[in-house]
């Protein structure tokens, strides 16, 4: 039966727009119109289903190509941080005592609801800031030290690109070695296996999900890698015409180019995710390889969580979630 399910999975061509995210002992699944969070707390499964409201539905201009990529990226980050905070609430840090005086003062001034919004906004800001610092500004800063020794813009761009890739891969590898992150990456694998099972048209059972691949071509890991690659290509082109020796000019331009870079990456991933041919499979390979670091084989209890989260967002109208 397992072999039959595996063969059926490989033959399937359906691609769903449903995507997910691994949480602390849980999984977030986002479908058309709603998202679901399922967490395995010490007291059992906790479920939270929310209706999805997209900013680009309210403001159509934000749904235009390129622009929608940046909007979707920020929106996903905000929702992802909220989901992580929700899951973390069920596993409080035993080493943390009573709330600090600052926490008490902040809650008193803002109220609990506003304080949660403030913390979420701060977390998103720090996450976005760290990403920009590590993968965009730090490589430019480090490459600035070689300016006195090179005269070619092409060589400078090459060195900066190599530094950027080294930082990216080092970050991925270091994250994969963290013990606290190992189980999160197992849930990441569970999310992928469950999506594959659903796309294959198989019943969502632990047995059927267990045999699926844990590397998915439309994973966020692939998106981040493509962002880095696109930024290298765009930067190399732009800095061939701009004052490439001025480190501060380069940093400022990196910031200005972020929106088009993320936008182009989003459109690229949409195309690759929606087509299955030799070219798209080749383009998807680097992202699939990187998932060796960001996914681990899940156990059956994790698959149960991912299955439940997916079940909660599958639309009643068949095909509504088609890619």
What are these language model-derived features?
Residues 2-23, 27-29, 99, 150, ...:
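Polar-ligand-bearing catalytic/cofactor-coordination segments
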Residues 2-92, 99:
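Divalent-cation
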Residues 53, 60, 70-73, 80-99, ...:
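Multi-pass alpha-helical transmembrane bundle typical of ion/small-solute transporters
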Residues 64-86, 160-185, 258-274:
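Hydrophobic alpha-helical membrane-embedded segments
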Residues 86-87, 127-152, 227-253, 266:
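Juxtamembrane "helix exit" motif at the C-terminal ends of alpha-helical transmembrane segments
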Residues 104-114, 142-159, 239-252, 271-282, ...:
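Membrane interface segments of multi-pass transport proteins and intramembrane proteases
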Residues 117-135, 217-228:
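Select subsegments of transmembrane alpha-helices in polytopic membrane proteins
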Residues 122-133, 158-162, 166, 252-259:
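Hydrophobic alpha-helical transmembrane segments of multi-pass membrane proteins
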């Amino acid at each position: 039966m397992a072999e039959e399910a595996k063969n059926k999975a490989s033959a399937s061509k359906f691609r769903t727009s449903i995507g997910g995210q691994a949480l602390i002992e849980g999984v977030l699944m986002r479908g058309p119109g709603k998202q679901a969070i399922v967490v395995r707390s010490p007291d059992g499964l906790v479920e939270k289903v929310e209706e999805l409201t997209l900013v680009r539905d309210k403001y159509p201009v934000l749904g235009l190509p390129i622009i929608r990529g940046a909007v979707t990226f920020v929106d996903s980050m905000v929702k992802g941080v909220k989901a992580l905070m929700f899951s973390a609430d069920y596993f409080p840090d035993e080493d943390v005592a009573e709330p600090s005086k600052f926490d008490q003062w902040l809650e008193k001034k803002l109220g609990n609801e506003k304080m949660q919004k403030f913390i979420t906004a701060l977390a998103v800001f720090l996450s976005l800031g760290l990403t920009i610092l590590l993968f965009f500004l730090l490589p430019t800063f480090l490459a600035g030290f070689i300016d006195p020794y090179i005269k070619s813009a092409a060589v400078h761009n090459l060195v900066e690109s190599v530094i950027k890739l080294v930082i990216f891969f080092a970050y991925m590898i270091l994250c994969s070695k963290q013990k606290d992150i190992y189980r999160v990456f197992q849930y990441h694998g569970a999310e992928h296996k469950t999506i594959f099972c659903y796309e294959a048209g198989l019943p969502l059972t632990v047995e059927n999900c267990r045999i699926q691949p844990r590397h998915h071509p439309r994973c966020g890991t692939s998106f981040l890698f493509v962002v880095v690659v696109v930024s290298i290509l765009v930067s190399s082109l732009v800095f061939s015409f701009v004052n490439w020796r001025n480190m501060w000019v380069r940093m400022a331009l990196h910031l200005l180019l972020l929106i088009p870079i993320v936008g182009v990456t989003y459109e690229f991933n949409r195309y690759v995710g929606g087509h299955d041919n030799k070219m798209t499979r080749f383009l998807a390979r680097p992202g699939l390889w990187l998932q060796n670091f960001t996914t681990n084989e899940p156990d059956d209890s994790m698959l149960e969580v991912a299955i439940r989260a997916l079940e909660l967002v599958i639309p009643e109208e068949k095909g509504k979630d088609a890619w």
